[in-house]
């Protein structure tokens, strides 16, 4: 093969055209850039979700100057475990363990995943975690709206530059209503939920 990145094709064959290694490397870098851009477009619901922050509860509004980078719909489940209440011997409650969800673009194609941390991971491998800033009540039977301040992203890609994440339009996900007592201590139960996640940056 020498300096060539590919084996020369037969006339009329389906093999890729011969390219010098330097040319191939440049092409691969370009494809990598295009791939990240494509993922960003996929994550950014098309058309991108419009958010009127002034209409949201004040605790979950993003700071002035933040702009929507992308938005996704999360569909998954939240796990709860029946545990004894802290400092309340003999009393039990459903304790939050963590979420697992798939993130979808507007075309309903998966573009990433969400899991305990909280952490959002794009299909390109870039990911962000963060710390909860505030919550605000949602409609009865739904988990609250939430504002998270993101830590620095890990990996170049769709999540790079994200500074805040909002959880909006929540459906379900609240703790089970089934009994939680000494006989069910340690039992885990998954509850389905949906939410829109809106990612902001400067």
Residue positions per predicted region:
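Exposed boundary/loop context
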Residues: 3-6, 35, 118
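Primary mode marks residue(s) on the alpha4-beta5-alpha5 output face of response regulator receiver
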Residues: 49-79, 86-202
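Sec-dependent signal peptide recognition
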Residues: 29-36
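Contiguous N-terminal and early-domain "leader" segments and peripheral loops that mark the onset or edge
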Residues: 9, 13, 47-53
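Short, Lys/Arg-enriched N-terminal segments with co-localized hydrophobic residues
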Residues: 3-27
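C-terminal motif of bacterial Sec signal peptides marking the signal peptidase cleavage site
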Residues: 41-42
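Polar low-complexity intrinsically disordered regions enriched in Ser/Thr and small residues
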Residues: 5-8, 15-16, 38, 128, ...
